[in-house]
């Protein structure tokens, strides 16, 4: 296919399609079966993992939920959001040893400030860590 090849020469291999309605997203976030996850990559703001223009969610998916939809818009309570990110997600994935803080269970803890947590990554400048994670 000659035409697509000519168009993409020298252009970064990245595409952002905005097809979701923000109103629909708000309703989906509130649904009792909705869990939160991301397909973002493990990246860094410096070194070999700071190349290209990845989707901003690689740096700020969970911070966006906590900052925008919990603190700013009040779509969910903080407790609901954390449960959807942890306990409910583990339950849906049938990870019996994850999702709760309890003796004998595996746990990775993230300490954050609910007053300041904010995603900073953008499509133009995606390599930015979220603020408010201690």
PLM feature spans:
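His/Asp/Glu-enriched, well-ordered alpha-helical/loop segment
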Residues: 1-9, 26-115
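Helix-coil boundary/capping segments in enzymes
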Residues: 16-18, 45
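Phosphate/diphosphate-binding loops
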Residues: 116, 121-134
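Buried, small/hydrophobic-residue-enriched core segments of structured protein domains
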Residues: 19-23
């Amino acid at each position: 296919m000659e035409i697509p090849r000519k168009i993409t020469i020298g252009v970064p291999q990245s595409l952002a399609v905005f097809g979701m309605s923000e109103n629909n997203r708000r309703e989906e976030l509130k649904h009792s079966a909705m869990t939160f996850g991301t397909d973002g990559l493990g990246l860094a703001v410096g070194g070999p993992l700071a190349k290209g223009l990845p989707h901003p969610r690689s740096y700020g998916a969970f911070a966006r939920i906590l900052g925008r939809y919990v603190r700013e818009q009040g779509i969910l309570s903080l407790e609901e959001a954390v449960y959807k990110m942890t306990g409910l997600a583990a339950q849906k994935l049938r990870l019996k040893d994850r999702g709760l803080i309890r003796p004998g269970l595996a746990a990775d803890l993230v300490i954050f400030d609910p007053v300041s947590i904010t995603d900073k990554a953008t499509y133009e400048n995606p390599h930015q860590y979220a603020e408010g994670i201690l």
